[in-house]
Amino acid sequence: MSHARRQRPNGSAARSRSAAARATPGAGRHRSIVELYRGWLISGIVAVVAVAVIAILVLKFGPSNSGKDAAAGAQPADPGLVATITGVPAATFDSVGVGSAANLPRALPSTASALQKDGKPELLYIGAEYCPYCAAQRWALMVALSRFGSFSNLHTTRSAANDAYPNTPTFTFYNAQYASQYLAFVAVEQTTNQPKGNGGYTSLQSLDADQQGLLGQYDRPPYTDSVGGIPFTDYGGKYVHVGAMYDPGLLAGKDWNQIATLLTDPASAQAKAILGSANLVSATICRMTGGQPGNVCQSAGVQAAAAKSGG
């Protein structure tokens, strides 16, 4: 079939067209001009269609405002999903209390410098998208911080496929915004979840000199059990916490919506882990904010967490 389309006209047909052209002066030239314009028109239409198709593909699959987001497989979080996770009723927090959360924040010496931003105490989080312990702890941080303010531009992602607890569903704080009248939240996701050819993972964000100094000073014993672990969280220069407060394996085999639904059931293992951890995080934040807001800091769940963590 394709060979037939490429076949030239046979000799007799070609001679007939040539004779007709000679019998009618100008006819051959007129036909050539028409055919030329027709070719230009077809070529133009094809070019316009091609440009339109490319534009659609770029909009759908091409880089977002952050090309690194696309490379890491992060997707904008569904607003309904975020609303479920950040809208857990106070009664559910109170029912869970500390739950199954462990690995408590540790107090810094009174000589430690206060960590502040824009006149408010600062909660500094340092993690990475590949890290399964970061993946687990982000759930607790996101839930807890939503009691003191609000997030926007959150994206879903997973921990690395080739690490412990592979593909743990989570959120990334990269490019997320947080607004609160009580505290500032600063997040640094150092790498994506995408391996590099020479080992490690693709770089995402860099620590500034002050952040690097805090990590070097406090991400070690006696403030944590080992040196250089993540996630690392500094609560206003008052407390630090390294690692996750629960087992990331509790999230295995589940997607974001399933986990969000389980948070509404205080008897579920996931609610006991994530909400219990969120109460511990909230109790530590309350020490940064002077006990504000009162409806959070004086709630039964946060008070239970404060009692367990020595406050």
Regions found by a protein language model. Give the residues of each.
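Short pre-active-site segment immediately N-terminal to redox-active cysteine/selenocysteine motifs
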Residues: G127-Y130
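Non-globular targeting/processing and membrane-anchoring segments
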Residues: M1-E122, A136-R138, V143-G311
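Cell wall/extracellular polymer interaction/catalysis modules
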Residues: Y133
